[in-house]
Amino acid sequence: MVLSIGENVTTSFEFAKDGLVGYWTRWLILFVAGCIPIVNFITFGYLVKIYRGVDVAPELEGYLEMFIDGLKLLIIEIVYIIVPLMLIVASTAFMETETVVETIDVSGMTITTGATIMPASEPTGVGLALILIGALLAVIFSLVATIAGIRFAKTGEFGEGFNFGAIFETINEIGWGHYILASIVFIIVVCIIAVVLSLIPYIGELLVMIIVPLLILWQGKFFENLYSCA
């Protein structure tokens, strides 16, 4: 069944809500695990379970398997972001520089005490181009990485996360325009919720942190639905 973007947002949210509300231990474990480096691989592993395609939120079991799957998913995500990240980092080599001369005045005589090369506030044309290209590629590669992660989850094969032919075929079936629009809509909805919660005095930021497990389930099911409807 093909879902509209609105239907996907709604049904995936219901999936997340039904999977956590009333299952407070599951919510707590995902929250705590997500806050601890390395242990948070378990959270990524739980996302892999959702990516495999389930009608209800899966049980939190098989922690070692989730840890390993989470590590594999994270590696896939990192590999895809390396290229745009390298371009953005390379742009710093093309930052304009200026020399700051340090002087002191002694009895009417100006004495130079040293000079320091400082980066200017704006990059050169080449640097700016690399930043823009890197940012654009980061967006594109993040879209590809999501489908790659889901493909890995569904096949159980790490190498399938780099099966570019199959990955791009899936994205073409989804439709690049639809995929990008759906991603933008989802991000906007999540940002609105996060901003509204953060504005609550005293407890706003804490509430945003608490709903992170809900957001993980929500986005996992949202993008799995896109994949499955292709």
Model-flagged regions — what are they?
Residues 39-98, 105, 113-127:
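Selected alpha-helical membrane-embedding segments in polytopic membrane proteins
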